[in-house]
Amino acid sequence: MEKLTKQAEEIMAERFGKDNVIALATVENGIPYVRSVNAFYDNKAFYIITHALSNKIRQIKGNPIVAISGEWFAAHGKGINLGYFGKAENSEIAEKLRVAFASWIDNGHNNFNDENTCILCIRLTDGLLLSHGTRYAIDFSD
């Protein structure tokens, strides 16, 4: 496994630096749970808009280690609830999410007046990326 190379980062940004559906797996009481989520990749992390009272946030609070998979990429990471979407500290990533998710973000599914509407960050730790016959085993740690 090697550190994230420039070439692998370019593939990640091109492939996932927009609206994507990925599988997000969590574990609670030894039982795995997986669901599809819309996600956006930026700087070694995936970002997801969700609700603070959702099962995924509860499960991540109990065990922050998660797994993801999508479009010839699988990885482990640490789930971090960044809190309310509208918090000043989240303004930069929130704007990126508004652009990436523009086709559906304001369709009524999200209530941005609800302080439980939050941003989930999946900070990647390690992963496997496949692209045109090349296998990239990546260590995302700093």
Task: Pin down the residues of each PLM region.
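Charged, gly/pro-rich active-site loop segments
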Residues: 2-3, 74-142
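Extreme N-terminal tail/first-helix region
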Residues: 1-18
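Short, conserved, surface-exposed binding loops centered on an aromatic residue
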Residues: 14-16, 31, 38-40, 59
